[in-house]
A protein has these predicted regions:
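N-terminal strand-loop element at the rim of the active site
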Residues: 10-17, 24-25, 29-77, 81, ...
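Carbohydrate-associated surface elements
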Residues: 44, 153, 172
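Membrane-proximal helix-turn-helix segments that form the acceptor-binding/catalytic region
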Residues: 124-147, 153-154, 160-161
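Acidic anion/phosphate-binding donor-loop and adjacent secondary structure
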Residues: 156-159, 170-190
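Conserved donor-binding/catalytic core segment of Leloir-type glycosyltransferases
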Residues: 185-204, 210-214
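Short hydrophobic beta-strand element within catalytic cores of glycosyltransferases
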Residues: 280-283
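Conserved acidic donor-binding segment of nucleotide-sugar-dependent glycosyltransferases
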Residues: 295-311, 319-325
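A short, well-ordered alpha-helix in the C-terminal region of glycosyltransferases
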Residues: 312, 326-340
Length: 366
């Protein structure tokens, strides 16, 4: 496979952690390790520590987007920086993530000409900015030669709302990083439960987990990862934001990963990371989580509870803790499931899309 020059555009600020940002950086590093030249553009302050292959696009603003608050960058300077990034890069392919986002992604799509690939992460959008941008977007989206959706939900939303027919390629995980710290399930020790997410964001569902914990008679250790203000809670260790290495270490020593999210999820990358680390995954019955856990199969990779129902979550946790054999079956299935999302496999699928759209020309910006 000949070496490619690849430009990747991220709409969300690297100043704050997020699934799309992590996906972009991981994909870039994977392709660099395979001998390709990769550059990334996205919002980021000068003080934010990032790899040298990232062009920092400057400050961003918090904007309500997709049921959450995203830090985006827009305005004349965004278009100027996107144009400079493209013309300087001489890329064989430009990979734009979330081209619907009013940030560097939308700007890059507007100015770019040539082989363009887009990845859609979101499965719904209630952004007022997007509603205003839809007439403009539909014309611009015709420039995309290869579309990718990270989940069936994201693919379906894109088809219904904006047209096109992206192919399904999931998010990737470096499974080996999480397998390194894997420990046997609890046996003669107190089981550990882990939650990861922004603590003060209602849709992440931390309050549901805390209410469920109040109903547990079994002794458990609970570790909560994530930034934001947190309530006082007995037997809960709030560790704040952690590095990727620390996250892998915590998941590796843990026994159960709980994802009580209320909605706004199109995939669930941390579920895959937890599976790779050997955790039992307990998640709300969102469509995205059900798909990741392969919940309808004879050997599911995780167990679901009714969305928003702390009583059902408590009952589910009780069942897992009291039945280690059942927990081990979920771990075994989850470990195999996680391998399907390994970056080695995912990057090959993405590269096939690149090879399909490339025609020997260079991406330019008008």
């Amino acid at each position: 496979m000949p070496s490619m020059r690849i430009g990747i555009v991220c709409p969300y600020s690297f100043d704050a952690p997020g699934g799309v940002q992590a996906h972009v950086l991981d994909l870039a590093e994977k392709f660099i390790s395979q001998g390709h030249h990769v550059e990334v553009l996205g919002p980021a302050s000068e003080s934010t520590q990032l790899p040298d292959f990232v062009t920092k696009g400057g400050a961003s603003l918090p904007i309500p987007y997709n049921g959450s608050v995203a830090r985006l960058s827009f305005g004349p300077s965004t278009f100027i920086r996107a144009r400079d990034f493209i013309n300087r890069g001489q890329f064989d392919v430009l990979h734009i993530h979330e081209p619907n986002s009013p940030s560097f992604s939308m700007a890059a799509l507007k100015v770019a000409r040539g082989p363009i690939v887009a990845t859609y992460h979101a499965s719904s959008n209630r952004s007022l900015a997007l509603k205003f941008a839809l007439p403009f977007l539909r014309g611009q989206l015709e420039k995309i030669r290869g579309g990718i959706a990270v989940s069936e939900m994201a693919r379906r939303w894109q088809v219904q709302m904006l047209g096109g027919d992206p192919i399904l390629i999931p998010n990737g995980v470096e499974t080996a990083q999480f397998e390194l710290n894997k420990k046997p399930l609890w046996s003669g020790r107190i089981p550990e439960i882990v939650f990861l997410g922004r603590l003060d964001e209602h849709r992440k569902g931390l309050d549901i987990l805390l209410r469920a914990l109040d109903q547990l008679d079994q002794e458990v250790r609970v570790t909560v990862i994530g930034g934001g203000n947190h309530p006082l809670a007995p037997r809960v260790d709030f560790v704040g934001r952690v590095s990727d290495e620390e996250k892998a270490e915590i998941l590796g020593r843990a026994d159960i990963y709980v994802a009580p999210n209320r909605g706004g999820e199109s995939f669930g990358i941390v579920l895959v990371e937890a599976m790779a680390a050997g955790c039992v995954v307990v998640a709300s019955d969102l469509e995205a989580f059900s798909a990741v856990c392969d919940a309808q199969s004879p050997e599911p990779s995780g167990i679901l509870f009714r969305n928003g129902d702390a009583d059902d979550l408590a009952s589910t946790l009780r069942n897992v803790i009291e039945n280690p054999k059942f927990g081990q079956e979920l771990v075994t299935s989850g470990t195999q499931r996680a391998k399907e999302f390994d970056w080695d496999n995912v990057s090959k699928e993405i590269m096939r899309v690149y090879e399909t759209v490339c025609d020997g020309t260079t991406v330019t910006a008008a």
